Amino acid sequence: MDERVATALGEAFPDRSVDRTFGVGPSWNGANETVGVAFADGGRGFCKVAVDGDGTRIARELAVLRYLDAERSIAGPTVLAGDPNASVPYLVTAPAPGGELLGVWEEAGETRREALLRRVGATLATLHAEPFESHGEIVGSDAAGGLDTERAPWPDVLRATIERTREIGTSERLAAHYDAVFDCVEANRERLEGAPAALLHGDVTKPNLFAVDDAGAGSDAHESAAGPDGIVPIDWELAHVGDPARDLVRAEDQLLNGFDSRGPDRYADALYQGYRDRAGGLPPGFAERRPVYEVVRMLGRSGFIDQWTTFLDEPLESLVERADAELRTRLDAV
């Protein structure tokens, strides 16, 4: 067992024996390590530790999960233990109900995939439904059990999230892309400042969503465990209070798109239709601000270009050229 994980589990569960830990799949985030935990009493959980000793991300995720548990607008995994101020900051959660969307997706036909995406869209609309007074970075829980935020104008919060992307990125090969994206945000500050404020997940991907079987939908037990749409988001460490349009653009990109290509229109339409059906429309100003967020999304390629090389099994220089070309195209569209 990793020494940091052992330290965290020993502090979190001093009277509970661990049978073993196990891997949970690859991650492109080098700032944290997450392992599955099998306890000797038969229980299971997932332990996330901050490998650099910085408890900021743990504090953020812990606060959001406690907030969701109190609000119950949508469900998140149950917190078993957590301490962002420990020598090894940690968060331990219970397994989320249902199956990881990545696996469910691979086994589903087109009709069910569209239905799943409508449910994801509805879940995001539910998350975004509660307005916040201002944008900001989440730093913990407040005295009333809500979210403690460092308030700032939305363009500044957006810049801060871009900085976080750079911190967890795995390659500086395309470092100039960050400067280009920062310049784009600054040039469009006035366009961005009018955005509404809502809680954003910040990293909607198939591995970060769990889907409960449709058969349970509509029951009280189903809604308690998995929210009204049977979709449970996990991994909230990148959550922030920002423009719902940004969350939706990122969700479409990470759920459906390739390195420099878009997924099938019918899938994107299903995601947005689910959102519209729940919210009555897309976030205000979505079309106006979307091109800026498309530029920001390029950093999910640029900052992890080495990971994409392995994932796509293509030469690095080839992907660098494609990324440069795609960024220019997106900047021209703003």
Model regions: which residues?
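ATP-binding pocket architecture of kinase catalytic cores
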Residues: 25-153, 169-175, 194
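A glycine-centered beta->alpha junction motif in the catalytic cores
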Residues: 95-108, 162-164, 298-314
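Active-site activation/catalytic loop segments of kinase-like enzymes and analogous catalytic loops
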Residues: 246-280, 294-311
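Activation of the activation-loop gatekeeper triad in protein kinase-fold domains
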Residues: 234-239
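An alpha-helical support segment within catalytic cores of ATP-dependent transferases
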Residues: 1-16, 129-202, 212-214, 220-229, ...
